Swiss-Prot record:
Controls the proximal-distal patterning in petals and the adaxial-abaxial determination of leaves. Involved in the repression of the homeobox gene BP. Keywords: Developmental protein. Disruption phenotype: No visible phenotype; due to the partial redundancy with AS2. Gain-of-function mutants iso-3D, iso-4D and dsl1-D (T-DNA and transposon tagging) show flowers and siliques bended downwards. Residues 249-260 have a biased composition (Polar residues). It comes from the Eukaryota. This is LOB domain-containing protein 36. Residues 6-107 form the LOB domain. Residues 245-313 are annotated as: Disordered. Residues 280-302 have a biased composition (Low complexity). It holds the Pfam family LOB. GO terms for biological process: leaf morphogenesis; petal development; proximal/distal pattern formation; regulation of DNA-templated transcription. The keyword Methyltransferase does not apply. Belongs to the LOB domain-containing protein family. It comes from Arabidopsis thaliana.
Length: 313
């Protein structure tokens, strides 16, 4: 019961004296008159009093709050009342649960180690066995399936980078092996087969130095199909071909006979050396034998040249 000066909102609305046994006094304070007005208009004071008397004291406050909520909703919407709001909220809750289930199913296909099996198995099972020489159409189908599987398999970029580095390393190894074979060929040519004349040894060393130094200047003459320079119009400058295809100057002589002999003398060994240098795939073991054969061919030429010089002298 409220104080003697201020009765409860229910007794004030009903215009009656509020006593100590008033059932409305604890739940309808005097400062909330609208609360009892809504409840009384919808349910009636006698019905509310009867309901509160049937409930326990610890449940009465919740019952009064629910009655006020229902009465307010009914006055706002006389057709549906609070049922309309409840149905709308239930429909939204059902839609949210449906969307949540779909999201979980979609997420399950991308998460976990077993998520790849339902995706990859249909693609591999659908591919028929291809012949040894597939046609262009089957090759295009295989390429398309390959490109479709790559995004799903999610190959990391680090693996591609490792493959590129491996290819670069293999290319460097091949280049090093080729360079080693070339150096081995040069060493075999320079040190193979002892010569009987120091003139031929000096000539071989000079040819190796000319090959390492690159192209020398060519003052005059023209290159023929065989790779040798022809004589100029004056006939005073004769140029030969050094080892490896480099053109070098030959000392000029006044004797045309000796010039022809020098050209003929250089023609055979240089062609033989060119065959050795420009075919690196052959083994380097028969190189000393070839050098000895070349020297045996040049020895009769040098002896005949010395005999002719003695006759002329």
């Amino acid at each position: 019961m409220a104080s003697s000066s201020s009765p409860c909102a229910a007794c004030k609305f009903l215009r009656r004296k509020c006593t100590q046994e008033c059932v409305f006094a604890p739940y309808f304070p005097p400062d909330q008159p609208q609360k009892f007005a809504f409840v009384h208009k919808v349910f009636g004071a006698s019905n509310v009093a009867k309901l509160l008397n049937e409930l326990a004291s610890n449940q009465r406050e919740d019952a009064v709050n629910s009655l006020f909520y229902e009465a307010e909703a009914r006055l706002r919407d006389p057709v549906y009342g609070c049922v309309g709001l409840i149905s709308i909220l239930q429909h939204r809750l059902k839609q949210v649960n449906h969307d949540l289930e779909n999201a979980k199913k979609e997420l399950a296909t991308y998460v976990g180690p077993q998520a790849m099996l339902p995706i990859l198995q249909p693609h591999f099972m659908s591919l028929p066995p291809q012949p040894q020489r597939p046609s262009s159409s089957s090759a295009s189908v295989l390429t398309q399936h390959h490109h479709n599987l790559l995004p799903m398999m999610a190959i990391p970029t680090g693996q591609l980078y490792h493959q590129q580095q491996q290819q670069i390393f293999e290319a460097q190894q091949l280049a090093a092996v080729a360079r080693e074979q070339q150096n081995e060929m040069f060493r075999a040519y320079g040190g193979g087969g002892g010569s009987s004349s120091p003139h031929h040894q000096n000539q071989a060393q000079a040819e190796i130095l000319r090959f390492n130094n690159g192209f020398d200047s060519v003052p005059a003459g023209s290159v023929t199909v065989t790779g040798f320079n022809q004589l100029s119009s004056g006939g005073t400058a004769v140029t030969g071909m050094s080892l490896g295809g480099n053109f070098v100057d030959s000392p000029s002589t006044n004797n045309n006979y000796h010039t022809d002999q020098q050209l003929h003398h250089h023609h055979q060994p240089q062609q033989h050396h060119e065959a050795q240098l420009f075919i690196p795939s052959q083994s380097s073991q028969p190189l000393p034998l070839q050098t000895q054969e070349t020297q045996t061919q040049t020895q009769p030429n040098s002896e005949s040249e010395e005999g002719r010089r003695n006759v002329i002298g």
